[in-house]
Amino acid sequence: MSQLLTARQAEELHKAMIAYLLSANLPKSAAALREELADSVQLDDSTAKKYEGLLEKKWTSVVRLQKKIMDLESRNNALQSELDSATPTSLARRNQDPVSWLPHAPARHILQSHREPVTCVGFHPVFSSLASGSDDTTIKIWDWELGELERTIKGHTKAVLDVDYGGPRGGTLLASCSSDLTIKLWDPSDGYKNIRTLPGHDHSVSAVRFIPSGAAGSPLSGNLLVSASRDKTLRIWDVTTGYCVKTLRGHVDWVRDVAASPDGRFLFSAGNDQVARLWDVSSGETKSTFLGHEHAVECVAFAPPTSYPHLSALAGLKKAPPSSSSAEYVATGSRDKSIRIWDARGTLIKTLIGHDNWVRALAFHPGGKYLLSVSDDKTLRCWDLTQECKCVRTVKDAHGHFISCIRWAPNIIKDAGVVNGDDTSTAASANGGALAASAINGVVPTGKKEDPGGGPMMGIRCVIATGSVDLKVRVFAS
């Protein structure tokens, strides 16, 4: 008898083996095993039925456990490597300072309810609400702090491709866009009632973003919304009237993504024509084109002013642009597996190589030091802009399938009630906003940024959300 098993365990194993041979239509082998074991195993037909399938279940359980052990060992090795390369001082600083915080496994919450791939996520600028959209045609609203589903919004008739919070001063709205050719506006303060539907695009609407307001040269209100479509156009909408006030033409193929600059003066878009474009919102004209990708460009992002010193050094400049300037640097991610960082004139500064599949979404760290990316290779990567854009962290298997989106929770702005047009002492900037742009001249150890002249203070929220083809939304938080 094996020294590894007790007599009872050995008997159970033998019964399972005989039952397996009988179920596999191998009666001679089963009889031979019975004879070999003599009277040590009593197994009648009813008992054999009970043990049928037990051996296969045990086997698959062992395989699953082995995989889990390997995953845990890999994660443990990664954490040990991080500890070995860190000093007590740097660890303390990293744990306390949101400016240096990066996401790591495991996720704080795994949100499950969608029945088809998750395509997009978006954070409410003030509350702990997170919206997710899916190919299942629904939008789901979650409490990201509790990890609970709050409600399911139905209205679109095809896949929901993007969501974004923002809107007029005094009232945050949720915008969504879909393959059904429409954009819908929902009112969070009224049970997410559908208050307006914006038709006009001739094909799927890929992306939607509210345009921030308040800076010189930008729109005077938060009433504007930009959308990108497979019909090759960008459209700017007035959400109070529902009218399209401007159509931007220049792309020659599907426009996949669009972003608005923190002060609302510029737009950045890209798509299947492999070209990114920087637009002036007021004139509707293209200011710069960005050429170099070898496949469709899936995602775009404006670099926050906090990153200007690092990106200027990367570009070889002795002096960084002032933090009050807009759209100085941008980033693009492509199906060619690369990420590219550019200046506003379209000059390539750096190409980031590391992903093994399409790059699907980008998010700059509000502290300005890092760029985060997600990909169809199922990883989340963190690139350090102060170290020649070296990949300093990879969250492997962040999801079980292609990762389609990533968003960083908007900064909390202290003593800036004007952002929402009310008297609240704490508000948030969903897109960076003009107040955000003016509040980043100084950084204090708490992770808050403040204007030395007495302007508003911004607190970084160390929370990001990702969505995937695996039907899940994951929330990573400090």
Swiss-Prot record:
Disulfide bonds: none
Molecular function terms from GO: dynein complex binding
Entry GO terms, CC: cytoplasm; microtubule; microtubule associated complex; spindle pole; transferase complex
Pfam families xrefs: LisH_PAC1 (PF24951), WD40 (PF00400)
Compartmental location: Cytoplasm, Cytoskeleton; Cytoplasm, Cytoskeleton, Spindle pole
Residues in coiled coil: 60-87
UniProt KW keywords: Cell cycle, Cell division, Coiled coil, Cytoplasm, Cytoskeleton, Microtubule, Mitosis, Repeat, Transport, WD repeat
WD repeat windows: 113-154, 156-196, 200-247, 250-289, 292-352, 354-393, 398-439, 440-477
Keyword Coiled coil: yes
GO biological process: cell division; establishment of mitotic spindle orientation; microtubule sliding
Domain LisH intervals: 9-41
Superkingdom in the source lineage: Eukaryota
SUPFAM superfamilies in the record: Lissencephaly-1 protein (Lis-1, PAF-AH alpha) N-terminal domain (SSF109925), WD40 repeat-like (SSF50978)
Family recorded in the similarity comment: Belongs to the WD repeat LIS1/nudF family.
Functional summary from the UniProt entry: Positively regulates the activity of the minus-end directed microtubule motor protein dynein. May enhance dynein-mediated microtubule sliding by targeting dynein to the microtubule plus end. Required for nuclear migration during vegetative growth as well as development. Required for retrograde early endosome (EE) transport from the hyphal tip. Required for localization of dynein to the mitotic spindle poles. Recruits additional proteins to the dynein complex at SPBs.
Protein name: Nuclear distribution protein PAC1
Organism: Paracoccidioides brasiliensis (strain Pb18)
